[in-house]
């Protein structure tokens, strides 16, 4: 019986890792062991980054809304409280886009929020 080796599978696996490490600097892009560790860490960072992106985007939306409502003479927290009282259900992404793309509609929402607060 002939002796079997894992050479084909091993070469394929190593090529795949080195392909993923293409563009990495120094030994991390050419040496298999270093590349394997670098690729693992890079994949972990990309996974975590996809989760963090959601929080970052929400923070950007809130900052944009805050800037837009302060121009109308009200703070962000009072604006959100007024929206809840008025029964306006718009998410922060929609409000942020509205503040940028349709300022007149956003101003109407701010006025409705102010009216609900009695300001």
From Swiss-Prot:
UniProt keyword annotations, A-Z: Ribonucleoprotein, Ribosomal protein, RNA-binding, rRNA-binding
Entry keyword annotation includes Transcription regulation: no
InterPro entries xref list: Ribosomal_bL20, RIBOSOMAL_L20_CS, Ribosomal_protein_bL20_C
A GO MF term: rRNA binding
GO biological process: ribosomal large subunit assembly; translation
GO cellular component assignments: ribonucleoprotein complex; ribosome
One Pfam assignment: Ribosomal_L20
Stored NCBIfam families: rplT_bact
Described purpose of this protein according to its UniProt entry: Binds directly to 23S ribosomal RNA and is necessary for the in vitro assembly process of the 50S ribosomal subunit. It is not involved in the protein synthesizing functions of that subunit.
Family: Belongs to the bacterial ribosomal protein bL20 family.
Alphabetized HAMAP family for the sequence: Ribosomal_bL20
Protein name (record): Large ribosomal subunit protein bL20
Organism: Treponema denticola (strain ATCC 35405 / DSM 14222 / CIP 103919 / JCM 8153 / KCTC 15104)
Lineage: Bacteria, Pseudomonadati, Spirochaetota, Spirochaetia, Spirochaetales
């Amino acid at each position: 019986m002939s002796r079997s080796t894992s050479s084909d599978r091993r070469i394929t696996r190593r090529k795949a890792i080195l392909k993923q490490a293409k563009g990495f600097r120094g030994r991390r892009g050419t040496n298999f062991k270093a590349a394997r560790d670098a690729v693992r860490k890079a994949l972990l960072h990309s996974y975590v980054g996809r989760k963090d992106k959601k929080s970052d985007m929400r923070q950007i939306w809130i900052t944009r809304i805050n800037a837009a409502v302060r121009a109308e003479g009200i703070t962000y927290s009072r604006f959100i409280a007024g929206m809840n009282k008025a029964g306006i259900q718009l998410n922060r992404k929609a409000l942020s886009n509205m503040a940028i793309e349709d300022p007149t509609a956003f101003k109407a929402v701010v006025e409705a929020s102010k009216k609900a607060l009695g300001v």
